[in-house]
Swiss-Prot record:
GO biological process, one term: isoleucine biosynthetic process
Cofactor(s), by name: Mg(2+); thiamine diphosphate
Main function: Involved in the cleavage of the C1-C2 bond of 3D-(3,5/4)-trihydroxycyclohexane-1,2-dione (THcHDO) to yield 5-deoxy-glucuronate (5DG).
Keyword Cell wall biogenesis/degradation: no
Name of the protein in its database record: 3D-(3,5/4)-trihydroxycyclohexane-1,2-dione hydrolase
GO CC annotations on file: acetolactate synthase complex
Amino-acid positions noted as binding Mg(2+) in the UniProt annotation, renumbered to this chain: D489, N516
NCBIfam families recorded: myo_inos_iolD
Protein keywords: Hydrolase, Magnesium, Metal-binding, NAD, Thiamine pyrophosphate
Gene Ontology molecular function: 3D-(3,5/4)-trihydroxycyclohexane-1,2-dione hydrolase activity; acetolactate synthase activity; flavin adenine dinucleotide binding; magnesium ion binding; thiamine pyrophosphate binding
InterPro entries cross-referenced by the UniProt entry: DHS-like_NAD/FAD-binding_dom, Myo_inos_IolD, THcHDO_hydrolase_firmi, THDP-binding, Thiamin_PyroP_enz_cen_dom, Thiamin_PyroP_enz_TPP-bd_dom, TPP-bd_CS, TPP_enz
Family in the record: Belongs to the TPP enzyme family.
Gene responsible for this protein: iolD
EC code: 3.7.1.22
Species whose genome carries this gene: Clostridium perfringens (strain 13 / Type A)
Length: 639
């Protein structure tokens, strides 16, 4: 079949399907693009001439549209994607950050950036990078470190092997992440006689591999000698749809479950054995039990530093680790005994073996007591008010900063109380989306939901700017559910362009913007380690040339109203509840500008985080922080 490379690519993508548990569905929903000279007359011509069943989406920022695509794939449990195409140069470079975000989170993302001419005839073309030591290097080489597969199509016939391998990676639960196929602009338009079999319908089967028997037997021997195990529920539980199997396993043997950011909402928050979030951003209950556990069973988790508290959380000297993971790489962390396979079938097999050996944990009232303690703390957090008895959760190191914010903005809302009002007001099955700042910590600790896949957190790359774009991606995946972006003012300012795309697609999203006039989370980290506030609050430059002037007030509601969103500016809890109720009635996207007091986010619960503190300083507070770091490091695992 004679056609251009661009036309062949479109036809190929339109014929890709996946099958999971007997359900077959189309894999590629469409293509996001911001057309430029390096893509519009090649791949762009193909999409105009015959897109097949592929939808063409128009992005506003290349990073933003790629975040939309990542969230779309995540919310579809990695079984549907939207590809992303861009022009050469800056358009391609803008997608590098999004590629890293997808790869870190093991989410399939297909990137199709335009590239400079394969023939080099017109070199240097507009937006081309020239390196004197290698003329073959282009901007697209920057994708290599952040992608799971990378290729460049220098001849039309190379498209075939490249796309077969792209699909191999995108549909492999153990290897998936970002894939970059660089498309030189001249090759996009070159015609070639492609074989018809390249365009046949391809069904990529996502299977449930079962680990070898020896791995189960060795795990059985370990578990039978342990009395107080815990389960860590990671993102792999969600993508395998193994939540029910994991709950059955936990109930059978009375084992408590702790959640990672990616694993949250795979099982019900209300379940008696669900302790909630674990680690640096974990809650009191999970971290209390984790401290004394003698066995950690990690299911579908990659054991990030936040989950393990930089490998210091599990303090029992007899603690061992078992992992159930489809990836050998992630399964081997923490010197764990590996069960390599699908979470659901492996948990079911392990359960049958433990049943046959009459295993049961020896917990008595520890789980109930831990949950009771956290319930009391939750009650306290959601009822913190800015009144005569107010005490900030984070002790302010800058005197008067909370009062200054309140006087300037009129804001009287504490962040933890705001989250309590939001949770009780929005729909039970609403999806919340987050990524960066203090909100992921507050949400992992405080957010409770029994609705499956309703907690959408990107905390692998914790990419500021993901939130609003991802809210649109989640809405495209599940248009019948309300979706809420939980975003700070810092992340909003970094990237909010896809609000316009949401308006264009007529997909209602809700943006809950927590404005505390700064990068509050990093300000806390900075000042808790003995450093003064420097460039983490949004302040004017003062007469001494320093960023020490007054806070910069921003009317975010007014900005968003210019885009056509229904907006609200709230300064009290009563106003917040009223705005949330009204927003539910709207047909268009909404933004609620919530003026939240600084230092009213949650702090940690018996968890340490290893950060690179200066080993020598003239500041006493920094030296004390370094000494504390060294003390904690001695108690942590080395790898």
């Amino acid at each position: 079949m004679r056609m251009t490379t661009g036309q062949a690519l479109v036809k190929f993508l339109d014929n890709q399907y996946v099958s999971f548990d007997g359900k077959e569905e189309k894999f590629v929903d469409g293509i996001f693009t911001i057309f430029g000279h390096g893509i519009v007359v090649g791949l762009g011509e193909a999409l105009y001439e015959n897109p097949g069943e592929l939808k063409v989406y128009q992005g506003r920022n290349e990073q933003g549209m790629a975040h939309v695509s990542t969230a779309f794939a995540k919310q579809n449990n990695r079984r549907k994607i939207i590809a992303c195409s861009s022009s050469v140069g800056p358009g391609a470079a803008n997608m590098v950050t999004a590629a890293a975000t997808a790869t870190v989170n093991n989410i399939p993302l297909l990137l199709l950036p335009g590239d400079s001419f394969a023939t080099r005839q017109p070199d240097p073309v507009l937006q081309q990078i020239e390196q004197s030591y290698n003329l073959g290097i282009t901007t697209n080489d920057a994708f290599k470190p952040v992608c799971k597969y990378w290729d460049r199509i220098n001849r039309p016939e190379q498209l075939m092997s490249a796309m077969i391998n792209a699909m191999r990676v995108l549909t492999d639960p153990a290897e998936t992440g970002a894939v970059c196929i660089a498309l030189p602009q001249d090759v996009q338009g070159e015609a070639y006689d492609f074989p018809e079999y390249f365009f046949k319908k391809r069904v990529h089967r996502i299977t449930r591999p079962l680990a070898v028997q020896e791995e189960f037997e060795e795990a059985l021997d370990i578990i039978m000698n342990k009395k107080k195990p815990i389960i860590i529920c990671g993102g792999g539980v969600r993508y395998s749809e193994a939540g029910e199997a994991l709950v059955d396993f936990a109930e059978e043997f009375n084992i408590p479950i702790c959640e990672t950011q990616a694993g949250k909402s795979a099982i019900k928050s209300s379940h008696p054995l669900n302790l909630g979030g674990i680690g640096v951003t974990g809650n009191l209950a999970a971290n209390m039990i984790a401290k004394d556990t003698d066995l950690v069973i990690g299911v579908g988790t990659r054991f990030s530093d936040f989950t393990t508290s930089s490998k210091s959380l599990f303090k029992n000297p007899e603690v061992d680790f078992i992992t159930v993971n489809v990836s050998k790489f992630h399964g081997g962390k923490m010197d764990a005994h590996k069960i390599i396979g699908d979470a659901k079938v492996c948990i079911e097999e392990l359960q049958a073996m433990l049943e046959a050996n009459n295993y049961e944990s020896s917990y008595e009232d520890e789980i109930v007591n831990a949950k009771k303690a956290w319930k009391e703390e939750m009650k306290r957090l959601t009822n913190i008010k800015y009144d005569e008895n107010f005490e900030a959760l984070i002790k302010p190191k800058r005197e008067g900063c909370i009062e200054e914010f309140s006087v300037l903005t009129g804001g009287l809302i504490t962040q933890t109380a705001a989250l309590g009002v939001i949770r009780e007001t929005i729909d039970d099955d609403a999806i919340v989306v987050g990524a960066a700042g203090s909100l992921p910590g507050d949400l992992q600790r405080m957010w409770e939901t029994d609705a499956r896949d309703s907690y959408h957190m990107e905390y692998g790359y914790s990419c500021m700017g993901y939130e609003i774009a991802a809210t649109l991606g989640a809405k495209l995946a599940e248009p019948e559910r309300e979706v809420y972006s939980m975003v700070g003012d810092g992340s909003y300012l970094m990237l909010h362009s896809e609000m316009v795309t949401a308006m264009q697609e007529q997909k209602k999203i809700n943006i809950l913007l927590f404005d505390n006039c700064g990068f509050g989370c990093i300000n806390n980290l900075q000042m808790s380690n003995g450093i003064g506030s420097l460039a983490t609050e949004f302040r004017y430059r003062d007469e001494n040339g320093k960023l020490e002037g007054g806070l910069i007030p921003i009317d975010f509601a007014k900005v968003a109203s210019g885009y056509g969103l229904k907006t609200y500016s709230v300064k009290t809890l009563a106003q917040l509840k009223e705005a949330l109720e009204d927003a539910k009635k709207q047909k268009v996207s909404t933004l609620i500008d919530i003026k939240v007091l600084p230092k009213t986010m949650t702090d940690g619960y018996d968890a340490w985080w290893h950060v690179g503190i200066a080993g020598e300083s003239e500041i006493d507070g920094v030296n004390k922080a370094f000494e504390n770091k060294e003390k904690n490091l001695k108690a942590a695992r080395r790898y």
